[in-house]
């Protein structure tokens, strides 16, 4: 039997800060190959100068329902090691807890799923794992390209689980069946520079910029059945002017929108343009651009694998899970283009923090939950 605790210890001890792989895939291949999985490493690079990324695709079985498990082995930097009471890559165990960068996000989910596969043995249908080493940073040469590659190899998926932290206080109390979309924007408001003593010879862009900030900030709608209201938050207001006697020539505004399933990136862009056009900017010019590539919102229907997972959790815990769409973006947004997807993992209270840790009992419970679902869905 494969011990999820030992596998997690071994994974944490690989300092796989994006995009450094360390030995994470070696460990996974060593665990999966004896279970009958064919493991393939795929490296992607390019696209705007992004760094090369190693990815792992492992698959076993043919025909029947095809279950995909997705996750990432990369972790965020640990920061100042002096802020940790346990070294970030030592995987020390104390008082029923295991400490280390990636313990919660999300090497524990991977360790639990691989251990669950070892526990249940042979299954009907097909099981695949798509593991990237670039989820925490640019996410350009990771899951999105790996899934396109897998589809080109003939793989079609019926349901996917992402092992990201999804629970709030106990394993199974919450799963994420959707995510809000995210769009980053920039507005440059241009006026005319001048001396503050002669405002009639200048055109101060700050009042116009403030008008736009107030017009666009806050809720964009009232929410939907499964999503909270869409929200636009300004994050930067910069004029590049440290003096008090110069009216600046321009103001640079940056913002992010987290939006629900009532919007697409295209409709959101048009709405923002419409609000800008309605404002009196006192002859200042406003140029709006989208920064980077927006991620779309998605929602998986409560049927098929989603319904089976809910039933499995309810049977084990006595309570159906909360169906959440909260939180930030994840690689589930890429998987949603191929099949229904749910995030189901541990509580994530300490992810990205110093002294990141999980309870060993939670790791054991997640392993048991995954094993029960594998039997229910593919048994």
Where are each of the predicted segments found?
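Metal-dependent amide/peptide-bond hydrolase catalytic core
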Residues: 165-170, 177, 183-379
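Phosphate-handling active-site elements
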Residues: 94-96, 116-129, 152-156, 216-225, ...
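Short beta-strand segments
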Residues: 70-72, 130-132, 160-164, 188-190, ...
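Acidic/histidine-rich catalytic neighborhood of metal-dependent amide-processing enzymes
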Residues: 106-178
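Active-site metal-coordination/substrate-binding segment of hydrolases
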Residues: 66-128, 362-365
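A structural signal for isolated positions on well-ordered beta-strands in alpha/beta enzyme cores
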Residues: 40, 68, 128-130, 287
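N-terminal helical capping/dimerization or prosegment-like subdomains
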Residues: 1-78, 250-254, 268-269, 360-362
């Amino acid at each position: 039997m494969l011990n999820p605790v030992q596998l997690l210890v071994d994974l944490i001890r690989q300092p796989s800060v994006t995009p450094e792989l360390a030995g994470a895939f070696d460990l996974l291949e060593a665990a999966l190959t004896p279970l009958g999985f064919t493991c393939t490493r795929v490296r992607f690079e390019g696209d705007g100068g992004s760094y090369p990324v190693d990815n792992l695709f492992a698959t076993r079985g043919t025909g029947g329902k095809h279950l995909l498990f997705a996750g990432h082995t990369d972790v965020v930097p640990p920061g100042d090691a002096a802020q940790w009471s346990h070294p970030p890559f030592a995987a020390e165990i104390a008082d029923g807890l295991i400490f280390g960068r990636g313990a919660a996000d999300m090497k524990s989910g991977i360790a639990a799923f691989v251990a669950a596969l070892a526990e249940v043995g042979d299954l009907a249908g097909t099981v695949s794992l798509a593991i990237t080493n670039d989820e925490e940073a640019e996410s350009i040469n990771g899951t999105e390209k790996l899934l396109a590659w897998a589809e080109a190899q003939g793989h079609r998926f019926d349901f996917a689980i992402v092992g990201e932290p999804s629970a709030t206080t106990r394993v199974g109390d919450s799963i994420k069946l959707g995510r809000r979309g995210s769009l980053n924007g920039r507005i440059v408001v241009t006026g005319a520079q001048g001396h503050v003593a002669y405002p009639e010879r200048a055109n101060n862009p700050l009042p116009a910029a403030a008008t736009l900030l107030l017009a666009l900030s806050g809720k964009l709608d009232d929410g939907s059945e499964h999503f909270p209201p869409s929200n636009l938050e300004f994050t930067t207001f910069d004029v590049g002017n440290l003096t008090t006697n110069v009216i600046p020539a321009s103001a640079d505004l940056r913002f992010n929108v987290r939006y629900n399933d009532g919007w697409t990136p295209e409709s959101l862009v048009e709405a923002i343009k419409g609000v800008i056009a309605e404002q009196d900017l006192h002859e200042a010019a406003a140029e709006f651009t989208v920064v980077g590539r927006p991620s779309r919102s998605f929602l998986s229907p409560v049927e098929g694998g989603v319904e089976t997972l809910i039933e499995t959790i309810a049977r084990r815990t006595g309570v159906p899970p909360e169906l959440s769409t909260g939180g930030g973006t994840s690689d589930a947004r890429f998987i949603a283009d191929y099949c229904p997807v749910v995030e189901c993992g541990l509580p994530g209270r300490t992810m990205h923090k110093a002294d990141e840790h999980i309870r060993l009992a939670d790791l054991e419970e997640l392993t048991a939950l995954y094993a029960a679902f594998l039997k229910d869905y593919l048994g």
